[in-house]
């Protein structure tokens, strides 16, 4: 067997494995209340720069076994693969909704937070959806995502 056939064979196997994993993860039972309760209970008094880690752990607590995450902005692409859909009305928040901000300025990894029913929470309890003046920029992209709609 030549090297090209081996590469093609492993690529097919890898794609099949990833596809099976995504189907499994999409079918997991999502409990947004448990996720929001977890992120709220574990929030720090102020930001420690680990928003993606804290929200990922909340997602796991909500029933989706997500063991590897990336930076905050990567969740804009990962969450739709897990069955989350973008919502357009920023005032139509529901418990468990997740907001993801693009990297901007010195915020190299973006920002991510979860709505707990009364406030946005990441690695700390936020006063509002905008946690830094960099995100007030009109060109700053963000997405609010919700599972199951």
Language-model segment annotations:
Residues 25-27, 92, 145:
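Short, intrinsically disordered low-complexity segments
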Residues 7-70:
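N-terminal capping segments
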Residues 42, 58, 79-81, 139:
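Generic alpha-helical secondary structure signal
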Residues 67-132, 136:
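...with weaker cross-activation on analogous glycine-rich loops/strands in unrelated enzymes
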Residues 9, 75-78, 141:
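Terminal low-complexity, poorly structured segments
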Residues 1-6:
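Positively charged n-region of N-terminal signal peptides that target proteins for export
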Residues 140-149:
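Low-complexity, Gly/Ser/Thr/Pro-rich intrinsically disordered linker/tail segments
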């Amino acid at each position: 067997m030549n090297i090209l056939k081996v590469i093609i064979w492993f690529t097919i196997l890898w794609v099949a494995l990833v596809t099976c994993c995504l189907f499994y993860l999409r079918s997991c039972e999502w409990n947004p209340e448990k996720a929001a309760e977890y992120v709220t209970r574990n929030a720090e008094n102020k930001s420690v720069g680990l928003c993606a880690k804290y929200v990922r752990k909340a997602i796991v607590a909500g029933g989706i076994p997500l063991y590897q995450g990336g930076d905050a902005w990567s969740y804009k692409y990962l969450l739709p693969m897990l069955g989350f859909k973008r919502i357009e009305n920023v005032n139509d928040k529901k418990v468990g909704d997740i907001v993801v901000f693009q990297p901007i300025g010195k915020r190299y990894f973006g920002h991510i937070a979860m709505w707990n029913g009364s406030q946005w929470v990441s690695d700390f309890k936020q006063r509002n959806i905008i946690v830094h003046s960099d995100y007030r920029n009109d060109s700053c992209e963000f997405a609010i995502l919700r599972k199951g709609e």
